[in-house]
Amino acid sequence: MKRVVIAGTSSMVGKTTISTGIMNALSKKNNVQPYKVGPDYIDPTYHTKATENTSRNLDSFFMDETQIRSLFKRHSQNKDISIIEGVRGLFEGISPYNDVGSTASVAKTIDSPIILLMDARSLTRSAAAIIKGFKSFDSELNIKGVIFNKIRGDGHLNKLKEAVKYYDGEIEIVGAIKRDENLAVAERHLGLVPTPEKTEELGKQIEFWGDTVLECLDIDKIIEISDVDFEIPVDNKNKDETLWKVDKNSSKIAIAFDESFNFYYHDNFDALKENGAKLEFFSPIHDFEIPNCDILYLGGGYPEIFSKELSKNTSMIESIRNFDGKIYGECGGLMYLTNSINGVDMLKLINADSIMTKNVQGLSYVIGSFKKDCIIGKEKETFKAHEFHYSKLININENDFSYEINRGTGIIDKLDGISIKDGRIVGGYAHQHAVGNPYFASCLSKL
């Protein structure tokens, strides 16, 4: 099972651009399975566009080693090669003392070779020192190659090669990419601009990244590095239960998915379907009303960017307000459920207002516990999730919260998951993953 991790020496070295370019280049002749280490839900949409295969998250905070291996094998078993984009620097996780949440932990769990990606601007001999330090820091890792990004030119590359080969004759130099503003990618406060906002433009951009990779990197060398003999052991006993709880329900779930709402973990969709749910996607901006369904799932996104468009679709707002089934709103979906976003009218189901701030209000892995049974969890059960938002709720006139936050921020006073309409509607900031909250799919899909 061919696999390789593209790991940065730090953040902002070009991981998403170059990893996506590698995925696109390989996809011209191979069936590529993409992955993202960590909880990011935007980067995987670029991978998916590049490969036409849905990118998945591998996260050692949400998942234990058995679950990571199980998910990896599930999605990679019929593919030619898997490319895993790391998060931050290779060793960054939730603690300065252990691997949890890091790229290194995932690489070890799936026994994957690693190609280091380094911003080599103004570096020569220091590049060799960085590589030597990374290789010696953890002997369990298999760092096989290096890619230099943002080099000045051929003379710079030759010096880099000479320095690295002098101090480390084993590491493969996979290639180097020159400084080029066309390789940059648009960002905003929560990260990259999501793919649903720029489909045609993005397709051309990703093709350019792929062409650049083919021109500058040794693709055959990447395939050679990825070709490892070790098969990943997976405990197949109760394999569904090792990932998430499964109850055979028969519900129909309508999921908000457009330019305003698109922050989802696709494993959540799999978990819902394995629990018997039929999924249908709709646009709160463009569609007249919600589809015929039993449950609404309003995920995260950028409703603050599209607040006027959402507010103008009065038929959709009326349709959701009149819906008498279960509604789950997550982060952006929570904001949509409130009275307003920055003064622009929204659904007015949760009696509070959403405002945007200049500073991050929540950025953390989350550990929480359910105070009671609710539409996404069981009383006293714990869950692991993620939060990242610049918004906050004000004028809160609700006092029924479904879960309390032990690690993280929540809505207010370490509480999250506002519950209204006798628990039929829940809105919270924590982004739930079906592995981190194994009851998520079985509870949400239940009629």
Swiss-Prot record:
Q: In which pathway does it act?
A: Cofactor biosynthesis; adenosylcobalamin biosynthesis; cob(II)yrinate a,c-diamide from sirohydrochlorin (anaerobic route): step 10/10
GO BP annotations, alphabetical order: cobalamin biosynthetic process; methanogenesis
- Per its Swiss-Prot or TrEMBL entry, what cofactor is needed? Mg(2+)
E.C. designation(s): 6.3.5.11, 6.3.5.12
Q: Where is this site: Increases nucleophilicity of active site Cys?
A: H431
Catalyzes what?
cob(II)yrinate + 2 L-glutamine + 2 ATP + 2 H2O = cob(II)yrinate a,c diamide + 2 L-glutamate + 2 ADP + 2 phosphate + 2 H(+); Ni-sirohydrochlorin + 2 L-glutamine + 2 ATP + 2 H2O = Ni-sirohydrochlorin a,c-diamide + 2 L-glutamate + 2 ADP + 2 phosphate + 2 H(+)
Name the UniProt key words of this record, in alphabetical order.
ATP-binding, Cobalamin biosynthesis, Glutamine amidotransferase, Ligase, Magnesium, Methanogenesis, Nucleotide-binding
Catalytic residues as annotated in Swiss-Prot or TrEMBL: C331
Q: Which Pfam families match?
A: CbiA, GATase_3
Entry GO MF terms: ATP binding; cobyrinic acid a,c-diamide synthase activity
Q: What class of enzyme is it?
A: ligase
> Any idea where the GATase cobBQ-type domain is?
252-439
The record ties this protein, via InterPro entries, to:
CbiA/CobB_synth, Class_I_gatase-like, CobQ/CobB/MinD/ParA_Nub-bd_dom, GATase_3, P-loop_NTPase
Specify the domain of life of the species encoding this protein: Archaea
The miscellaneous remark of the record is: The a and c carboxylates of cobyrinate and Ni-sirohydrochlorin are activated for nucleophilic attack via formation of a phosphorylated intermediate by ATP. CbiA catalyzes first the amidation of the c-carboxylate, and then that of the a-carboxylate.
Role played: Catalyzes the ATP-dependent amidation of the two carboxylate groups at positions a and c of cobyrinate, using either L-glutamine or ammonia as the nitrogen source. Involved in the biosynthesis of the unique nickel-containing tetrapyrrole coenzyme F430, the prosthetic group of methyl-coenzyme M reductase (MCR), which plays a key role in methanogenesis and anaerobic methane oxidation. Catalyzes the ATP-dependent amidation of the two carboxylate groups at positions a and c of Ni-sirohydrochlorin, using L-glutamine or ammonia as the nitrogen source.
HAMAP family, sorted: CobB_CbiA
Quoted from the entry, the domain comment is: Comprises of two domains. The C-terminal domain contains the binding site for glutamine and catalyzes the hydrolysis of this substrate to glutamate and ammonia. The N-terminal domain is anticipated to bind ATP, and cobyrinate or Ni-sirohydrochlorin, and catalyzes the ultimate synthesis of the diamide product. The ammonia produced via the glutaminase domain is probably translocated to the adjacent domain via a molecular tunnel, where it reacts with an activated intermediate.
The family line of this record is:
Belongs to the CobB/CbiA family.
Indicate what this protein is called per its UniProt record. Answer: Cobyrinate a,c-diamide synthase
Name the lineage: Archaea, Methanobacteriati, Methanobacteriota, Methanomada group, Methanococci
